[in-house]
């Protein structure tokens, strides 16, 4: 399962939010997915050029206002969409103040630069496309949302 999402900070809740991109190139609607009404924060996000990307196979929590339960992602800016990393682990360690030696340059960038930019300056406009995968929603089977990131 993989899909691309638009990422932005919700300044009211101080939470990193993910919004699925819209339609496939053929303009075909997505079948079997119910989408809640967009919040004011989601509506404030500008239209994104990646609206042609597919969303087939996303779990239902991907459309939750709290965002997906768990996330594996990498930035499209680096042209590394095929090698996502588990951001939940990095975010948890960062929240606890733990430091580990990252195995890749990409992981180092995300941990030390991208999250810091989001925490201190807000959204980094060049880094908007992410790969979703490995969601706990399917494994745990719980309906309760899990906000995966709040800035310190």
UniProtKB/Swiss-Prot annotation:
Record's comment on post-translational modification: A fraction may be phosphorylated in insect cells and HepG2 cells, a human hepatoblastoma cell line. Phosphorylated in vitro by host protein kinase C or mitogen-activated protein kinase. N-acetylated in insect cells.
InterPro entries the record matches: Transactivation_prot_X
Keyword Transcription regulation: yes
Region entry Mitochondrial targeting sequence, spans: 68-115
UniProt keyword Lipid metabolism present: no
Localisation per UniProt entry: Host cytoplasm; Host nucleus; Host mitochondrion
GO cellular component entries: host cell mitochondrion; host cell nucleus
Pfam families: X
Keywords recorded for this protein, A-Z: Activation of host NF-kappa-B by virus, Activator, Apoptosis, Host cytoplasm, Host G2/M cell cycle arrest by virus, Host mitochondrion, Host nucleus, Host-virus interaction, Modulation of host cell cycle by virus, Transcription, Transcription regulation
GO BP terms: DNA-templated transcription; symbiont-mediated activation of host NF-kappaB cascade; symbiont-mediated arrest of host cell cycle during G2/M transition; viral genome replication
Family: Belongs to the orthohepadnavirus protein X family.
Function: Multifunctional protein that plays a role in silencing host antiviral defenses and promoting viral transcription. Does not seem to be essential for HBV infection. May be directly involved in development of cirrhosis and liver cancer (hepatocellular carcinoma). Most of cytosolic activities involve modulation of cytosolic calcium. The effect on apoptosis is controversial depending on the cell types in which the studies have been conducted. May induce apoptosis by localizing in mitochondria and causing loss of mitochondrial membrane potential.
Summary of subunit composition and partner proteins: May form homodimer. May interact with host CEBPA, CFLAR, CREB1, DDB1, E4F1, HBXIP, HSPD1/HSP60, NFKBIA, POLR2E and SMAD4. Interacts with host SMC5-SMC6 complex and induces its degradation. Interacts with host TRPC4AP; leading to prevent ubiquitination of TRPC4AP. Interacts with host PLSCR1; this interaction promotes ubiquitination and degradation of HBx and impairs HBx-mediated cell proliferation.
Record's protein name: Protein X
Species this protein is from: Woolly monkey hepatitis B virus (isolate Louisville)
Primary gene name: X
């Amino acid at each position: 399962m993989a899909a691309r999402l638009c990422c932005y900070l919700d300044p009211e809740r101080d939470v990193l939010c993910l919004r699925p991109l819209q339609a496939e190139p053929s303009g075909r609607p997505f079948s079997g997915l119910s989408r809640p009404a967009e919040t004011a924060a989601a509506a404030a996000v500008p239209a994104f050029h990646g609206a042609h990307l597919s969303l087939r196979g996303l779990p239902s929590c991907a459309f939750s206002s709290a965002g997906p339960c768990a996330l594996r992602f990498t930035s499209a800016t680096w042209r590394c969409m095929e090698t996502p990393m588990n951001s939940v682990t990095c975010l948890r360690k960062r929240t606890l103040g733990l430091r580990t030696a990252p195995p890749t340059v990409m992981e180092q960038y995300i941990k030390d630069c991208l999250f810091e930019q989001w925490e201190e300056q807000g959204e980094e406009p060049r880094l908007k496309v992410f790969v979703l995968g490995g969601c706990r929603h399917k494994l745990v089977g719980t309906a309760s949302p899990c906000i995966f990131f709040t800035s310190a």
